């Protein structure tokens, strides 16, 4: 991390189909080796699946899923007097979004459906309902923070 000045955040352009910045960020996060068209096909395919199977607005399902998966607190290691403590800290808004997207991606990858679009559609639908692998990860992080609440006075 640079110590001189704060590095400016890059502006992410909204995606062409839905005009949503979060969808564009998720596509960029899903993209491998610069293959954006493949990432677009996966995300839009997942959105079509949500539309046909659930009959709900895919953009709404996506935003609800993201908001459900966002963590509020996490633990950070802090060394105090020769012992490492897991100190619960609040998560910055930008990191919340990044973690939620990362967890959704990883949970979708672990699913057993045939195509990535189907996996992502299933994971987004489940996360919007408060279930699924990404929600399990968020609950695990929250549980760790709750268990280590006694060390919250070791602030950073």
Curated annotation (Swiss-Prot):
Q: Name one GO cellular component term.
A: small ribosomal subunit
Q: Could you tell me what this protein does?
A: One of the primary rRNA binding proteins, it binds directly to 16S rRNA where it nucleates assembly of the head domain of the 30S subunit. Is located at the subunit interface close to the decoding center, probably blocks exit of the E-site tRNA.
* Family matches, as Gene3D superfamilies: Ribosomal protein S7 domain
Name of the gene encoding the protein in the UniProt record: rpsG
Domain of life assignment: Bacteria
**Descriptive protein name:** Small ribosomal subunit protein uS7
What transmembrane ranges does the database entry give? none
The record's listing under Pfam families reads:
Ribosomal_S7
Q: What is the phylogenetic placement of the source species in the record?
A: Bacteria, Pseudomonadati, Pseudomonadota, Betaproteobacteria, Burkholderiales
Task: Please give the PROSITE patterns that the UniProt record associates with this protein.
Answer: RIBOSOMAL_S7 (PS00052)
According to its UniProt entry, one GO biological process term is:
translation
Give the record's keywords alphabetically. Ribonucleoprotein, Ribosomal protein, RNA-binding, rRNA-binding, tRNA-binding
Family designation: Belongs to the universal ribosomal protein uS7 family.
Q: How does it assemble?
A: Part of the 30S ribosomal subunit. Contacts proteins S9 and S11.
Which SUPFAM superfamilies would you find in this protein's record? Ribosomal protein S7
Gene Ontology molecular function: any one: structural constituent of ribosome
């Amino acid at each position: 991390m640079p110590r001189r000045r704060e590095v400016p955040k890059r502006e992410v352009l909204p995606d062409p189909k839905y005009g949503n910045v979060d969808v564009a960020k998720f596509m960029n996060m899903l993209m491998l080796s610069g293959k954006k068209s493949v990432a677009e096909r996966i995300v839009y395919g997942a959105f079509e699946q949500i539309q046909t199977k659930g009959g709900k607005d895919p953009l709404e399902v996506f935003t609800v899923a993201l908001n459900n998966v966002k963590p509020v607190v996490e633990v950070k290691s802090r060394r105090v007097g020769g012992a490492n403590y897991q100190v619960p800290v609040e998560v910055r808004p930008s990191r919340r979004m990044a973690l939620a997207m990362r967890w959704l991606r990883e949970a979708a990858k672990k699913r057993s459906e045939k195509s990535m679009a189907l996996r992502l559609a299933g994971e987004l639908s489940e996360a919007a309902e408060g279930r699924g692998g990404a929600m399990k990860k968020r609950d695990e992080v929250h549980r760790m923070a709750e268990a280590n609440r006694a060390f919250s006075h070791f602030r950073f």
